[in-house]
UniProtKB/Swiss-Prot annotation:
One of its GO terms (molecular function) is mRNA binding. This is Large ribosomal subunit protein uL13. It comes from the Bacteria. Keywords: Ribonucleoprotein, Ribosomal protein.
Length: 142
């Protein structure tokens, strides 16, 4: 019996929508990363992007446990000398509501060209509306 290897042009991709209202950031991010990678499918192949498209709505209402709203730090650099900038989860959510979940999922995906292709299949929206109704996404409960 030969081992099955998925080919990129044979992969069937579905669309799923996740309502993040009141959900914990890490729990949502780990399931989203798993589905973007395609590990939930029996035809998963490590070197082929077999994952699905994920639409996350109500990203502005995602929660973190404990004191992480004030204690969790996010860093970025302006590319100028001494240009490191730091913000916490609370301020990041106020300024860019979907950025925290994007960064959490991106950190859970592989680094390199395959991981960059996977993160492009993640669509995050702060409110309940999204422009992907034509794809008929199936609701996914986490």
């Amino acid at each position: 019996m030969k081992t099955f290897v998925a080919k990129p042009h044979e992969v069937q991709r579905d669309w799923f929508v996740i309502d993040a209202k009141g959900k914990v950031l890490g729990r949502v991010a780990s399931e989203v990363a798993r589905r973007l990678r395609g590990k939930h499918k029996p035809e998963f192949t490590p070197h082929v992007d077999t994952g699905d498209y994920i639409v996350i709505i109500n990203a502005a209402e995602i929660v973190v446990t404990g004191n992480k709203a004030q204690d969790k730090k996010y860093f970025r650099h302006t590319t100028y000398p001494g240009g490191i900038r730091e913000t916490n989860f609370e301020k990041l959510q106020q300024r860019f509501p979907g950025r925290a979940i994007q960064k959490a999922v991106k950190g859970m995906l592989p680094k390199g060209p395959l991981g960059y292709a996977m993160i492009k299949k993640l669509k995050v929206y702060a409110g309940a509306e999204h422009p992907h109704t034509a794809q008929q996404p199936k609701p996914l409960d986490i």
